[in-house]
Each structure stands twice: as structure tokens, then as C-alpha cells.
Design a protein with these regions (language model features):
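Alpha-helical multipass membrane-protein architecture
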Residues: 1-618
Length: 618
């Protein structure tokens, strides 16, 4: 069977058209949501559910065709995240008066396509030859299989029950504001050190922890506990103006401690690539004759050609920005190297916690730091240097966002028996479709609401929190004030974690300390790490075994599906009205925390019961 024959019934015209349409819609919706709230909604599972309904109504659909639709559609959402986390910084710093169409399309398109290209040689290393869970990939595959009867009537009922529970919880929490999104408090000692205690009340995070298991959830929690129970209290103890309480701990984390995670991600990413060197060389060295047609990736000749074609216009842009041919070429090479490094890091971390919880902003900060320092050393403190660093960061952020999403989709495809080449083409289609609508959408939002801090002219301005952080990092290098000590400290912690993991490996310990999992814990809010850890504990005590796809996995997939779908539905009236509380019930005493805690406990118990019953049946 030829390579094209392996794609028959998958990359159909109607699948491509539907995938492109969903990519455009979801990229526009997530552009607003990301600027407004600082987060985006994962599109793989919602797109899978939508495509199930549309393609089955058209007739003669199959699960692999649906998989192509969600692959293309999810690219739009991921690209939107890369764009809105970075490019608004150029507007806020005054370098761009608006979002110029050609430059926005070029930066986003190059970054998104690089994300696909850079992760092609990683597929076998991370998906085929790795124990990484890719929780959203598993959940997407479970949804699609259930939709075509692969789970049976009972399994489909479990999936639907989880989806209803996840959707209602999201509606009550984020829409109606019946309870708080997180249960949190703090304990303050006599020396003014505050210890944060809390957890997100998110069924989807509980499900992610259940899917990845305790061996990944625990190192993430350990990283979080180090940041929030050791580093932050120490900073507060020796600072006279840090304050106390939950808000104070979060302020210290935002300004200083999360840079530990940035440094750790940088070192951990390089270490992870070194560990994957054998698989990478094997991927580059394989030939078409050594791989089954159904398992072939895009050819190396195509990847290399695309790489050159994408690099040339970016090099020209950097030459124009810096007014230096040598400088522009060097920055373009740095961009390519950083795109490969951090696409790999994002792909690896998507395997740990899923693309929804992937800290793409962390790898973007690391990129902007490295680029800005180099530009400052060679070109001095000029605004063009800060802008160039932001643009490099934007390309890498788009590449990392697409890289993590691409690997998640390829995991789903691996479970379903899909053609990797067909999925990689679908990802590129989704990227190309989304780039042409993001520039006008961003310009529309800029003129309608404003982007950046609220002022008299823009009382409803969209805060764009990640882009504000990127601007602060880039300008901080040229103007001073960045917490370099914390970045370096994070790198040293990564080296220590690598050493500890080596000791555990030599002793044959069942507990390991993967450095990127610990780095993730250092960077993320502790409330997120705790919610994932709870799911990991449920998985461990219920006897769930990695790789098994029983009713517990279907329930977890349902929880993720319901929350993701409801997140998009809630975003529609919020976007239309410009009010985050448009659905909130104005009732005295709301929101509360305890109803969400009771719900989380009940869902944890449900996952435990389902898994125990499956375990007992075997």
C-alpha cells in the first residue's frame, strides 16, 4: 500500500473542510478568551464531539476521518494561544500601533508550521517508544472510539455521565458562579511567612491526574510544594513588604518564584533532548522502506524544504528590524534552535499533563530571556532589540503550542491506528487557516476593547496577562530588574533533580523524579498541581494500571470533554457581552468553596469505584 493509500478514508475533502472551518472558529474564540482571561480552551475533544455529529449526519463516516477533523481544528486553538500570549506585547510597548496583517500572518504562520515540522522526528521517541500518558490524547481517542461503538453501550453511558458531570461543574463554577473555582487559604507564622494551601475544583484536572497516574502527578506536586512551601515562605520571611495571606503568596510566586520553573525548564529541556538523542537519530536515519506505509511521517525532503522556506522571510524581517545582515541571520538561527528545543519540551510536557495545562508561557519566557540577552550584548539597549526578542518569542511560543498539541493528536491517532502523515498534513491545514483570521480578529478586539491596562479611554480593556509578562521580561533585560538569581536557581534545582533521579534509577526505585515534571510543578500554581495529584492518588489506590482503557479512563475522558465543551459555550456570551459575570447568579453568600469540594470528592469516589470494579472483574 502506498503512503497516499494509507491516508485514504482519513484525509478526505469533507474532513479537511470541516477541520479548517472549526480551526478558524476556535482560533477566533480563543483569541478573545486568552486576551480576556489569560487562558485558552483545549479544542481536540470539543472538535471530536462536533465532528462526530456532523460527519455521522453526512453518512459513511469513520473514526479516522473524525480524528483528522479534530487534529486540524485543535491547531487553530493552539495557534491562538501562541499568538495572544506574545504579539500584543508589541502593541502595549508601542512598537506596533495595530496588528499589521502581513507581519502577524508571517510570524504566526512560521511559528505554527515550525511546531509541526520540529515535532515530526519526535513522534516515535515520545509516542511509540515512551511511557508518556498524553492524557488528552487518550481522552480524545476514547471519545472517538465510544462514538463509534468501540466502548459498548455501558462504556458510552459512563463517558456520557462523565461529560454531563464535567459540564455541569464548569457551568456552576465559571458560569453561574455558584462556587469558587478554587478552595484556598493560607497559614501565616510569627515571622510573617505564609504557606499557601489550596486546590482547583476542576473535574478535568482530577481526570488528568487519574490518567497520568501517581508516578507523574507526585513529582509535579513535589516541585509545587518546594516552590510554595519552601521558597515563597523564605522570601516572605526576609522581606519587610511582602505582606501575608493568599494574595501575598501569589504575588511573590508571580514576581519571583515561578522563574525557578523557567530555569528548570531550560535545563530540563536540554537534558530531555539529550536523553532522546538515540530515538531522534533513528528517526532521521529511517527510510521509507523500513517503515510501514500506515506509520510514515512526512518525508525528510519535505521537512527540510519547508524549514528553509520558512526561515528565509523571518531572517529578512530580523535584518530589517536590526539593520544588520549578520545580526538578522544569527537571530533567525537562534529562533530555529529555540523552536526545536522548546517544541520538544512542550511535546514532552503535553505527555505529562496534557496540552491544556502545558506551560507554554514558561518556555516562551526562557526564549525571550536568551534572545534579549544576546541582542543586548551585541546591539545595546534599543527598542528594536526588545521587539526582536518578542518576535522570536512569538515564533517559538506558536511552535511550542502547536508542538504540544500535535503530539497529543498523534497519541490519539496512534491509539486509533491513524496515519501520522495524514495528521501532520491536517495540522498544517489548521495552522494555515487560522493565521489568516487572527490578525483581523486581534485588530477588531484592540479597537473595540483595547488591549493592556485599563484606562479612561479603554475602561473594558482586555488585560492580556501573558503578553504583559513577556513585555516586562523583554524590557527588563534592556532596562534591568529581572530576577536572574531565581532563573539560575531553577537551573541548579534541575541539575539536583537529575542527580536524584539517577540515584533512584540505580536503586531500582518505583518512584522516579523526571526533571521536567518537577520543573512543571515549580512553574504552575500549587492549586493546579494539587488537583492533578489528587487524581494521581485516586488512580494509585484504585489499582489502575498504566495503559489500561477501562471504564475509569472513559469516565475521566468524559470529565475532560464536558468541562472543555462547557468552557467554550460559556465563552460565547462572555465574548458577546464583554462581561465575565454575564451568567452569574446574584445571590447572597455566593460563591462558596464547599460545594465544589464535595463534588470533587464524589467524582474521585466514582473513579475509584469504576476502577475497582474493572480490576475485580479481571
Amino acid at each position: 500500500m502506498s503512503g497516499s493509500g494509507a491516508m485514504e478514508g482519513q484525509l478526505t475533502l469533507r474532513a479537511a473542510v470541516l477541520g479548517v472551518a472549526l480551526a478558524v472558529l476556535l482560533s477566533a474564540a480563543n483569541a478573545y478568551l486568552g486576551l480576556f482571561a489569560g487562558l485558552t480552551v483545549s479544542a481536540s475533544i470539543p472538535a471530536a464531539v462536533i465532528s462526530l455529529g456532523v460527519l455521522r449526519a453526512l453518512g459513511n463516516a469513520n473514526v479516522l476521518e473524525n480524528n483528522i477533523v479534530q487534529t486540524a481544528a485543535s491547531a487553530g486553538e493552539s495557534l491562538a494561544a501562541g499568538v495572544i500570549f506574545t504579539l500584543p506585547a508589541l502593541v502595549m510597548m508601542g512598537y506596533w500601533p495595530d496588528f499589521p496583517y502581513f507581519q502577524t500572518v508571517l510570524i504566526a504562520g512560521v511559528g505554527g508550521l515550525l511546531g509541526v515540522i520540529m515535532t515530526v522526528p519526535l513522534r516515535r521517541a515520545l509516542v511509540d517508544d515512551s511511557p508518556l500518558a498524553f492524557p488528552e490524547g487518550q481522552a480524545t481517542a476514547a471519545v472517538l472510539k465510544a462514538g463509534y461503538g468501540g466502548a459498548g453501550a455501558a462504556g458510552l453511558g459512563v463517558l456520557a455521565g462523565g461529560a454531563v458531570a464535567g459540564a455541569l461543574a464548569k457551568l456552576a463554577d465559571s458560569g453561574l458562579k455558584l462556587w469558587q473555582g478554587a478552595a484556598e487559604t493560607s497559614v501565616t507564622l510569627a515571622n510573617q511567612s505564609s504557606f499557601y494551601i489550596g486546590s482547583y475544583l476542576s473535574p478535568a484536572l482530577l481526570a488528568v491526574g487519574y490518567i497520568v497516574g501517581i508516578n507523574i502527578a507526585l513529582p509535579i506536586l513535589i516541585g509545587g510544594l518546594f516552590a510554595w512551601w519552601i521558597a515563597i515562605p523564605l522570601v516572605m520571611a526576609f522581606s519587610s513588604d511582602a505582606g501575608t495571606g493568599v494574595a501575598a503568596t501569589q504575588a511573590v510566586w508571580s514576581a519571583q518564584i515561578r522563574y525557578l520553573g523557567v530555569g528548570a525548564m531550560l535545563v530540563g529541556g536540554l537534558y530531555a533532548l539529550w536523553g532522546l538523542r538515540g530515538s531522534l537519530f533513528g528517526a532521521f536515519g529511517s527510510t521509507a522502506e523500513t517503515v510501514l506505509p500506515s506509520q510514515r511521517d512526512l518525508p525528510r525532503s519535505v521537512l527540510i524544504t519547508l524549514l528553509v522556506v520558512l526561515a528565509i522571510p523571518m531572517a529578512v524581517l530580523y535584518v530589517w528590524l536590526l539593520d544588520s545582515i549578520v545580526g538578522g541571520v544569527i537571530v533567525a538561527l537562534v529562533m530555529l534552535a529555540a523552536a526545536f528545543l522548546f517544541s520538544a519540551v512542550a511535546a514532552y510536557m503535553a505527555g505529562l499533563v496534557g496540552s491544556s495545562n502545558n506551560p507554554v508561557s514558561g518556555v516562551t519566557i526562557a526564549t525571550i530571556l536568551m534572545t534579549a540577552v544576546g541582542l543586548w550584548l551585541f546591539f545595546g539597549a534599543e527598542q528594536a532589540g526588545a521587539a526582536s526578542a518578542i518576535i522570536v518569542g512569538a515564533v517559538v511560543c506558536c511552535a511550542a503550542a502547536i508542538g504540544g498539541d500535535n503530539m497529543q493528536d498523534l497519541k490519539a491517532g496512534s491509539i486509533l491506528g491513524a496515519s501520522p502523515r495524514a495528521q501532520q498534513i491536517a495540522q498544517m491545514l489548521g495552522v494555515v487557516a487560522a493565521v489568516f483570521v487572527l490578525a483581523p480578529v486581534l485588530s477588531l478586539l484592540l479597537h473595540a476593547y483595547g488591549i493592556g491596562p485599563v484606562d479612561a479611554a479603554h475602561p473594558n480593556s482586555l488585560p492580556a496577562p501573558q503578553a504583559s509578562l513577556m513585555m516586562a521580561v523583554a524590557q527588563g533585560v534592556f532596562e534591568g530588574g529581572l530576577p536572574w538569581d531565581w532563573v539560575i536557581g531553577g537551573g541548579l534545582l534541575a541539575f539536583a533533580t537529575i542527580g536524584l533521579d539517577g540515584v533512584l534509577a540505580r536503586r531500582g526505585s518505583g518512584l522516579r523524579m523526571p526533571v521536567l515534571a518537577v520543573a512543571l510543578g515549580l512553574y504552575l500554581p500549587l492549586s493546579l498541581s494539587v488537583a492533578i495529584a489528587v487524581g494521581g492518588v485516586v488512580s494509585a489506590v484504585s489499582g489502575a494500571k498504566p495503559g489500561e482503557h477501562g471504564r475509569g479512563l472513559l469516565a475521566a475522558a468524559g470529565l475532560i470533554t464536558g468541562e472543555a465543551l462547557m468552557g467554550i459555550l460559556i465563552a460565547l456570551p462572555v465574548a458577546a457581552s464583554g462581561r465575565p459575570d454575564v451568567l452569574a447568579l446574584d445571590l447572597a453568600g455566593l460563591p462558596l468553596a464547599w460545594p465544589g469540594m464535595v463534588l470533587m470528592a464524589g467524582l474521585a469516589g466514582w473513579l475509584w469505584i469504576l476502577t475497582r470494579r474493572d480490576t475485580s472483574a479481571h
